[in-house]
Amino acid sequence: MNESFDKDFSNHTPMMQQYLKLKAQHPEILLFYRMGDFYELFYDDAKRASQLLDISLTKRGASAGEPIPMAGIPHHAVENYLAKLVNQGESVAICEQIGDPATSKGPVERKVVRIVTPGTISDEALLQERQDNLLAAIWQDGKGYGYATLDISSGRFRLSEPADRETMAAELQRTNPAELLYAEDFAEMALIEGRRGLRRRPLWEFEIDTARQQLNLQFGTRDLVGFGVENASRGLCAAGCLLQYVKDTQRTSLPHIRSITMERQQDSIIMDAATRRNLEITQNLAGGVENTLAAVLDCTVTPMGSRMLKRWLHMPVRNTDILRERQQTIGALQDTVSELQPVLRQVGDLERILARLALRTARPRDLARMRHAFQQLPELHAQLETVDSAPVQALRKKMGDFAELRDLLERAIIDAPPVLVRDGGVIAPGYHEELDEWRALADGATDYLDCLEIRERERTGLDTLKVGYNAVHGYYIQISRGQSHLAPINYVRRQTLKNAERYIIPELKEYEDKVLTSKGKALALEKQLYDELFDLLLPHLADLQQSANALAELDVLVNLAERAWTLNYTCPTFTDKPGIRITEGRHPVVEQVLNEPFIANPLNLSPQRRMLIITGPNMGGKSTYMRQTALIALLAYIGSYVPAQNVEIGPIDRIFTRVGAADDLASGRSTFMVEMTETANILHNATENSLVLMDEIGRGTSTYDGLSLAWACAENLANKIKALTLFATHYFELTQLPEKMEGVANVHLDALEHGDTIAFMHSVQDGAASKSYGLAVAALAGVPKEVIKRARQKLRELESISPNAAATQVDGTQMSLLAAPEEASPAVEALENLDPDSLTPRQALEWIYRLKSLV
């Protein structure tokens, strides 16, 4: 049967009718249909689930005359299966039994209680703890894009309005949403194709009036002026759709989503998608996390601190007041790192616990962890109180104390609660008198049964008699088969076993009813008290979220203080003067993976020295030198200390990199096309305050096409845009640029060649390189000796053709580098055919005269 169901379900059994009606409401996602201790899937859902989860596909009888494909998973293992599905971009509707089987006529009443989607998960089992999990929505009109993101596990709600396609692509790269909502008429599908968790939504969900109404209702406001987003119509369209989707899937109130923030380009350093990829900030070029900037810098001790640090790295701020405050805090905290980090480690992931509290899905162990976090606050306050720093004291104030809530949770929750409240044993003894009474009644069963067993043995004289309990038959008196014929007349047989008989007596049955009632009453009351705890905690949610944010920021700053001390970083100085001056700068990642000391290098960029033409051998360190400059600037603009002896840095609005390239086969773009697209983006968007890294421009095409493009790009950047530029090249003709224009200088990375070997010095020197050492590098790479020999031969031949051809033809027509050598003269031909060993002295003399006549 296909899932495009006919609306007439009358041919099906009542249970399948109920299932099909629920499934018709959620046709595009999997439906987990609760039946007893299992969640069942039927028809096409069962087939898909069996493939996605590698579970058995079976059949369940027949309905409407056809066998029903079925697959099932145990309810206690549902989180593991949900995690697998979410990681594959699937969404699941969870359908629970809400009716009482004992009183239901026909199928037990069921309804979908929540929808689990990749972008709306909050359960810790489904989340990557050190990575944000974002739901996003994108909207487009003739003026640009609207983009909104929400981290439901923290309540962080952001919107932006990228003006063009490149900026929008950069935002998608930066935020990397787990789920992306888009309008059904979205025109730029190429922009989002291939992304995980794509969800097509109807146009009406993006209506601006509906969006304003939804957002005002959520925040309890009359307008959005206070959030600074009133006029961001494109962003609001996206935000409205996103909020509607969250409400549809969560089916509960969202008190932790209390505000929305506008992210403006002018507030942060802009990095496009290529730059984020090339700088390997949180992901390396192979898609992993090893040997990235975050891998070196992130030694935070809480998951929420780790997530905040990654947000900082992907969004460096331009406000130097904020940056200087962070620098001051890092300096002030350096002496207390070893005391603070062990305490902070105990705080855990308070941010996500609070989100689950707001959604009323927090489990007993979440509340125990919250209590443990509160218990660390007095120690943190005591340690920070002595730190002489206004920013530190401001953070300490935001952390709060929450002594009353700590006391409440200490009284209410036992030390090591079970996973689920339905298992009982969550509320601590002494917290509620009535609960203690019901528990005492239930727990007193053991003493009563021991007394009953002793009494009945003495009364009957049956030494094999014992009293027991099982979940199926309840309490019983058991007598061995050999003595069962001696059972008293008031013993009513309940169960026959191979070697024994089990009985019940009125007294035991009466006690059983009493105990089971007390257990049920205790569990029901415990669940009620647990829910009341939420009601007591939620009024403090805003203060708790502020505290969690302050603790995460403290973790980040303490971590940066530790990294600065451990890795020998220094505090950079911000200046209003354009430029970057670095003394003994180092690459933060490369220096950690090298087995030998890293060679530190200087850099000086200023209005009088805007562009460096960087030459030198392959493997000499040109790309490392360029990237380390960008990473030092990036670290400075998150407020961190930097890997250098001294850094003075002026205003930077954007960082661009044109470093390396590969075919983009999915989009049908060659390596050269990718290179030129990235170059065009730089030339259109760079400003005099931009930091631009250009590596080997033009190498993807013919020599003189490439040289001409590289020359023109360098001219444009130096003369028109006047950006701060590092321009690495193997075109030695470009080393003439400093002679032709102001603000351009040559530097090179040194190497020493000895015979057929080469030693890279990795040190930056003024002036142009003398040669490229390409053949020496090829020999190091293991290219066969005969190939290297032939290459040297061809190199000499090419150099003899026109050693200065390139310099004289930069603006001229392209000359063939592999032109055929000139015809040999008759004298040369005669010599080639001559065998000197076969000549007599007289013949040799004659040949000399003959050759002279041929010259």
From Swiss-Prot:
Presence of the UniProt keyword Cell inner membrane in the record: no
Gene3D superfamilies for the chain: 1.10.1420.10, 6.10.140.430, DNA repair protein MutS, domain I (3.40.1170.10), MutS, connector domain (3.30.420.110), P-loop containing nucleotide triphosphate hydrolases (3.40.50.300)
Any one annotated GO CC term: cytosol
Keyword Metal-binding: no
A GO BP entry: mismatch repair
Binding site for ATP: 616-623
GO molecular function ontology, one term from the record: mismatched DNA binding
Keywords: ATP-binding, DNA damage, DNA repair, DNA-binding, Nucleotide-binding
Pfam families reported in the protein's UniProt record: MutS_I, MutS_II, MutS_III, MutS_IV, MutS_V
InterPro entries assigned to the protein according to its UniProt record, in alphabetical order: DNA_mismatch_repair_MutS (IPR005748), DNA_mismatch_repair_MutS-lik_N (IPR007695), DNA_mismatch_repair_MutS/MSH (IPR017261), DNA_mismatch_repair_MutS_C (IPR000432), DNA_mismatch_repair_MutS_clamp (IPR007861), DNA_mismatch_repair_MutS_core (IPR007696), DNA_mismatch_repair_MutS_N (IPR016151), DNA_mismatch_repair_MutS_sf (IPR036187)
Leader sequence residues: none
Family in the record: Belongs to the DNA mismatch repair MutS family.
PANTHER family: DNA MISMATCH REPAIR PROTEIN MSH1, MITOCHONDRIAL, DNA MISMATCH REPAIR PROTEIN MUTS FAMILY MEMBER
Function noted in UniProt: This protein is involved in the repair of mismatches in DNA. It is possible that it carries out the mismatch recognition step. This protein has a weak ATPase activity.
Protein's UniProt name: DNA mismatch repair protein MutS
Originating species: Salmonella dublin (strain CT_02021853)
Lineage of origin: Bacteria, Pseudomonadati, Pseudomonadota, Gammaproteobacteria, Enterobacterales
